[in-house]
Amino acid sequence: MTTAASPIDPITGVLEAFASHDVVAICDGGHGCEQAYAFRISLIRDARFAHMVNDIVVESGNSLYQEMMDRFVAGEDVPEDTLRQAWQNTTQPHDVWDRPVFEGLFREVREVNTSLPKDRQIRILLGDPPIDWSKISSAEDLVEAWNAAGGRDSWPVRIIQREVLAKRRRALVIYGGMHLLRKNLYWQAKNQELVNHQFNPLPDGIVSLLQSQRIEVFSVWVPVFVDPATLQADVTSWPTPSLAHIRGTPLGEASFRSYYPHPIFTRHDDGIEEIYVDPIRSPVMQEQFDAILYLGPPTALTWSQLSPTLV
């Protein structure tokens, strides 16, 4: 039976999820949505957060610099040019992590930690594989380093196992939503056999890898490019932000394509093809995520911009 999703206080909803889960994963909101960032800051500043959560695992930092980040969030002085290496020397050749919202999270945790005793201070765990670019001088060097790390999703899973679960801690994971899928997607393409081969081995995202080891994860999608009100009309009346559990609701029974209408690009013998999620064969939303964080319609959202000094 389908019933309408109902909004709840998002901070309380996330913290309640930690009562039954050691890992809660939240989509970062399109790599730069300022309202998604504002929610994360409100969550971290909430006095209950540090009582329940020990670590924050982020996509936006190279784990090679973990020791330096530990010192920074603990309040030690770290030179600006040294600190920036954590997000500027990742495996990703783009400027997304230079958007102020990503550095801002590190500085916010540092600030929150000033009011916490040492044994309750929040730790930032950098999730990107530890590529040392000073040692990369050829494609072969990069392949070797990449193979040693094991991939952008398997590496943070190792970190969570070693630094969080083995130490009986709890972690908030902040990553792009496509890293948090439970099940693989099907894609519409001309060469369906090739696409199925490329995209449908065993699931290998962060959440699916953890759950394959019987570690249950509570996961939250943040819709910033589509309006959930197209799936359930009364969403327009919800306060922003709001959290909503989606199983058994119109929001949960909708196709994943309803939330992710974007193409990806695949390469084959005929060139590069633009492909989209197959809404019929792919798992529906409630098979991928437990809840959504509603921030308002896409037209009301704003985006973190690069500093003019970096443009």
Locations of regions flagged by a protein language model:
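Compositional signal for N-terminal targeting/processing segments
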Residues: 1-311
